[in-house]
Swiss-Prot record:
Superkingdom field: Bacteria
Keywords recorded for this protein, A-Z: Cell inner membrane, Cell membrane, GTP-binding, Hydrolase, Membrane, Nucleotide-binding, Protein biosynthesis
Keyword Cell membrane assigned: yes
Membrane topology: Peripheral membrane protein
Disulphide bridges: none
Family from the record: Belongs to the TRAFAC class translation factor GTPase superfamily. Classic translation factor GTPase family. LepA subfamily.
Binding site for GTP: D14, H15, G16, K17, S18, T19, N131, K132, I133, D134
Protein name: Elongation factor 4
Organism annotation: Shewanella putrefaciens (strain CN-32 / ATCC BAA-453)
Pfam families, per database record: EFG_C (PF00679), GTP_EFTU (PF00009), GTP_EFTU_D2 (PF03144), LepA_C (PF06421)
Major localisation: membrane
One Gene Ontology CC term in the entry: plasma membrane
Amino acid sequence: MKHIRNFSIIAHIDHGKSTLSDRLIQVCGGLTDREMDSQVLDSMDLERERGITIKAQSVTLDYKAKDGQVYQLNFIDTPGHVDFSYEVSRSLAACEGALLVVDAGQGVEAQTLANCYTALDMNLDVVPILNKIDLPQADPERVAAEIEDIVGIDAMDAVRCSAKTGVGVDDVLEVIVAKIPPPEGDPDAPLQALIIDSWFDNYLGVVSLVRIKHGSLKKGDKFKVMSTGQNHTADRVGIFTPKQTDKTELKTGEVGFVIAGLKEIHGAPVGDTLTLAKNGADKPLPGFKKVKPQVYAGVFPISTDEYENFRDALNKLSLNDASLFFEPESSSALGFGFRIGYLGLLHMEIVQERLEREYNLELITTAPTVVYEVVMTNGETIYVDNPSDLPAINNIEEMREPIVEANILVPKEYLGNVITLCIEKRGTQVNMVYHGNQVAVTYHLPMAEVVMDFFDRLKSTSRGYASLEYNFIRFDPADMVRLDILINGDRVDALAMVIHRSNIRHRGLALVEKMKELIPRQMFDIAIQAAVGSQIIARSTVKALRKDVTAKCYGGDVSRKKKLLNKQKEGKKRMKQVGNVEVPQEAFLAVLKLNE
């Protein structure tokens, strides 16, 4: 056990984490040069394309150190993006130390900071590493000072390397051996193993990545999943070198995989504890929290006969993504679909893109909403994630909206823009600290404002330099109302949205004007109204097309024309009573665009 080192890498997007891991694998000879592929660990096409890491992965490498000993390095890859922070906290729970990789040109970013604090809270040893020193704009001295100033860990003797050219990678390996402590655990205690991640393999069933905290797990052992209480047999155990390699047992402190032929991922929830079926441990390992979706949206297939395929696709996707939540939903305008819960906007985009790409579905997504806490007049509290489920106004005592604490790091020349944006989004400033050239601002913002377009706006007002990290803190009472769109007096459920009372005039007007352009003209007038409760706040009318019924009369008496015009008038009146209006799909999409 003295020769095991478990570590993960904390880094902001694009600071070179995946490239560094490629180098470590190459130096330790995990893959031959021919098999080496850039970003080995990002196995999803989407991960490669966007250059981000989504799922946690692990690799076990043997490294012969300068002191002549062979060390087993277990490296657990973590995502760097704010939406996947739960994946990060889980990866960190399996380690004793973390490498803090910072781009020597760009310096510290907000998400790096957030994940770094998570690591320090878990009592991990954080080892700073300055990457990309081959770049002309690299300034390792300044960045080292910035790490000390902002993160508060000693960084003057931080290892300097360039993962791309391979300079200094050996020093990184030495520092892992020297600075990161070996795992602690009792090999003779009952088995306790943390599930870091699970994914679904078409041939093997569910593959779980585990870290053995105490005891050991042998091939053929019967084990129990603690949260569900079910027993399974370990058909295969082993490690990734990145290639899957079978072993006879996983010992204390090691990280590896277990395959038990499970059919669905919920049988081995991520973050859960495994123990032996006989003489098992009494209590699970700490740190298992069920992850709650923060953002909900209705998703509908464009053609209704795709519904079955859509359902299968979601089921398959949720095999790999334990944080995905979905339930069937039907809408009078869009047909049958699902209400899907996501961790955040990036997660939402990625899920939608994977559905469209891997399963060839064409989908429409309604505007994302957050979960509101509603206190009813009869005293009960309900949670609502869909605007059309909101009770009538007179039954609501008060509405509370979720508030997030957003930590923003921004260069000081853009501070003014960022503050203006936060105020416009109804934020309250909590804290502001200057660190050299960067400013760390903390705001409490309504989550509904953050999920709409906050991130994009933040990036554009700061020319891409600001970085954001947020987490949910509490529900606060707020004056929120539901804005309905009525077409000829009928509510269109897919267009309802929950917004703050101060925005309703502006939003209502913009919506009805937009709808007016998109709904095709009929033979009768169509009234488009925006309403809150029973109060109409904006209206526009799509004028009727007129057929010239008097064209065939020339000359003659005026009463003849009057008769024809009156007949037309009667007909229009009748049509207006029975005619219903098809709302084209462009109209729905336009409303979603309007939020941006």
